[in-house]
C-alpha cells in the first residue's frame, strides 16, 4: 500500500500531493522492457484499470468503443446506426489530430439522430463526473501505416486511446522512447481510420526517468524540452516508473489531467499543465470554492486561471 496522502490545502480532491511515501524499494536489478511493461500493467490493474489482453487491432478497438459509449450514454446502437455515428462524426475520414482534440475538449457531445427519429446527446466523455469514465489498458496494439508498428502500452478512456506509453529498459536513454513516439506519429498514429488520432498525452519511461507531454502538431512544442516530470507540491520530482504510476496514473489524477488541466487553445495547440501550474490552479480554485457557493463564480475563476497560466507554457 502506498501512502500518498495529504494533498495540498488538505483536500482529497487535489491531485498534486504534499506527501508521498512508497512502501517499495526502487529496483536496482536488471529489468527488460518486457519486465517494465508487465509490472506497469499489473500496477494499473491494482489501481482499478481493466486490462484487455486480447485487444490489439482496430476492429476490436472499435467494438470496445461501442460498448463503452453505450454504457456511458445508456443507449444501444443498431449496427447501421453505429456505422453512421462512426463515419459521420466520431471518426470522419477528414478528421486529423486537431479535429480529434477538439472533440475531446470542446465538441465532446454530439446530437445523434437514431433511425427511429429520436435525438439523443452522445457524450465521448463525462466531464462533470469524471470517475464515470471507464479507464482500460491494452498492450502491443498493432497498426499499419507507412510502416507497421506495435505500441507498448495504451490507456483507453471510454474505449478511445487517449494516452500512449512507450518504455525502454533501465539504462537506455529516455530520449530513445521520445524518438520512437515521433516515429510512430509519422508512420502510423495518424494513418487513415486510426483512432490513435485521439491521443492526448504521451508518457515515456526507461524505468528510472518518466516524463509526460502533450500530443501536438506544433513543431516548436514537439521538442524533448517540453517533456515534463511529475512532482509533489514542493516540486520534488517523481521520476521512477512505479512512483509515477502510483501518483500520475491514479484514475482520479489522470482523468483530471486529461479533462481539467489540458487546454486546447485558440491557436489549435494542445497544452498540458506542469505540476506547479496544476498546484497553483488547485489552490486558487479551492479558495474560490471556499469563499463562494456560486457555480458560475467557480467557472469564471477557472477560466481566469487558465488564461493567467499561459505565460508559463
Curated annotation (Swiss-Prot):
Family according to the record: Belongs to the HsdR family.
Mutant phenotype after disruption: Manifests the latent anticodon nuclease (prrC, ACNase).
Record's subunit section: The type I restriction/modification system is composed of three polypeptides R, M and S; the restriction enzyme has stoichiometry R(2)M(2)S(1) while the methyltransferase is M(2)S(1).
Enzyme Commission number, as recorded: 3.1.21.3
Keyword DNA damage attributed: no
Catalytic activity: Endonucleolytic cleavage of DNA to give random double-stranded fragments with terminal 5'-phosphates, ATP is simultaneously hydrolyzed
Function: The subtype C restriction (R) subunit of a type I restriction enzyme that recognizes 5'-CCAN(7)RTGC-3' and cleaves a random distance away. The R subunit is required for both endonuclease and ATPase activities but not for modification. Cleaves only non-methylated DNA, hemi-methylated and fully methylated DNA are not substrates. After locating a non-methylated recognition site, the enzyme complex serves as a molecular motor that translocates DNA in an ATP-dependent manner until a collision occurs that triggers cleavage.
Name of the protein in its database record: Type I restriction enzyme EcoprrI endonuclease subunit
UniProt entry keywords in alphabetical sequence: ATP-binding, DNA-binding, Endonuclease, Hydrolase, Nuclease, Nucleotide-binding, Restriction system
KW Nucleotide-binding (keyword) present: yes
GO MF annotations, alphabetized: ATP binding; DNA binding; type I site-specific deoxyribonuclease activity
Source superkingdom: Bacteria
Biological processes per GO annotation: DNA restriction-modification system
InterPro entries listed in its UniProt record: Restrct_endonuc_type1_HsdR_N (IPR007409), Type-I_R_enzyme_R_subunit (IPR051268)
Pfam families, per the entry: HSDR_N
Amino acid at each position: 500500500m502506498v501512502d500518498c496522502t495529504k494533498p495540498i490545502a488538505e483536500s482529497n480532491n487535489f491531485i498534486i500531493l504534499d506527501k508521498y511515501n512508497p512502501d517499495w524499494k526502487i529496483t536496482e536489478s536488471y529489468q527488460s522492457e518486457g519486465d517494465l511493461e508487465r509490472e506497469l500493467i499489473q500496477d494499473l490493474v491494482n489501481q482499478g484499470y481493466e486490462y484487455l489482453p486480447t485487444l490489439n487491432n482496430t476492429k476490436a478497438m472499435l467494438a470496445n468503443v461501442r460498448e463503452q459509449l453505450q454504457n456511458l450514454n445508456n443507449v444501444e446502437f443498431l449496427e447501421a446506426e453505429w456505422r453512421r455515428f462512426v463515419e459521420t462524426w466520431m471518426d470522419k475520414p477528414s478528421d486529423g489530430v486537431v479535429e480529434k482534440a477538439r472533440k475531446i475538449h470542446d465538441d465532446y457531445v454530439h446530437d445523434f439522430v437514431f433511425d427511429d427519429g429520436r435525438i439523443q446527446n452522445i457524450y465521448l466523455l463525462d466531464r462533470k463526473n469524471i470517475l464515470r469514465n471507464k479507464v482500460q489498458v491494452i498492450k502491443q496494439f498493432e497498426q499499419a501505416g507507412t510502416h507497421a508498428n506495435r505500441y507498448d502500452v495504451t490507456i483507453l478512456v471510454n474505449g478511445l486511446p487517449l494516452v500512449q506509453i512507450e518504455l525502454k529498459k533501465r539504462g537506455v536513454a529516455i530520449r530513445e522512447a521520445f524518438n520512437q513516439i515521433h516515429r510512430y506519429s509519422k508512420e502510423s498514429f495518424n494513418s487513415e481510420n486510426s483512432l490513435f488520432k485521439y491521443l492526448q498525452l504521451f508518457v515515456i519511461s526507461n524505468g528510472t526517468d518518466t516524463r509526460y507531454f502533450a500530443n501536438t502538431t506544433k513543431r516548436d512544442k514537439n521538442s524533448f524540452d517540453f517533456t515534463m516530470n511529475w512532482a509533489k507540491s514542493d516540486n520534488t520530482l517523481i521520476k521512477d516508473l512505479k512512483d509515477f504510476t502510483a501518483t500520475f496514473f491514479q484514475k482520479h489524477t489522470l482523468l483530471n489531467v486529461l479533462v481539467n488541466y489540458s487546454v486546447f487553445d485558440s491557436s489549435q495547440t494542445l497544452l498540458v499543465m506542469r505540476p506547479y501550474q496544476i498546484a497553483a490552479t488547485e489552490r486558487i480554485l479551492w479558495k474560490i470554492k471556499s469563499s463562494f457557493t456560486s457555480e458560475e463564480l467557480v467557472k469564471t475563476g477557472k477560466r481566469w486561471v487558465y488564461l493567467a497560466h499561459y505565460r508559463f507554457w
